[in-house]
Swiss-Prot record:
Entry annotated with the keyword Ribosomal protein: yes
The protein's name: Small ribosomal subunit protein bS21
This protein's record includes keyword Ribosomal protein: yes
Alphabetical list of PANTHER family matching this protein: MITOCHONDRIAL 28S RIBOSOMAL PROTEIN S21 (PTHR21109), SMALL RIBOSOMAL SUBUNIT PROTEIN BS21 (PTHR21109:SF22)
InterPro entries, sorted: Ribosomal_bS21, Ribosomal_bS21_sf
One GO process term, biological-process aspect: translation
Cited NCBIfam families: S21p
GO cellular component: ribonucleoprotein complex; ribosome
UniProt keyword annotations, A-Z: Ribonucleoprotein, Ribosomal protein
The family this protein is said to belong to: Belongs to the bacterial ribosomal protein bS21 family.
Length: 64
């Protein structure tokens, strides 16, 4: 769980900025977006295979 303690003399905006950075670093927002809607295991596998194929094609193009 991400948490931020407000230091003496620290503004709310600075504390909020630190909290957002910690959330981003922990991957909380991307995890929330990923879990927002249920995705069947077969769909997950297809997306994963497609992403791997795209990475391979990109890597091939880069090597030429």
């Amino acid at each position: 769980m991400t948490g931020v303690r407000v230091k003496d003399g620290e503004s709310f905006e600075n504390a909020m900025k630190r909290f957002k950075k910690q959330c981003e670093k922990a991957g909380i927002l991307s995890e929330i977006r990923k879990r927002e809607h249920y995705e069947k295991p077969s769909v997950k596998r297809k997306k994963k295979a497609l992403a791997a194929k795209k990475r391979a094609m990109k890597k091939m193009r880069k090597s030429f």
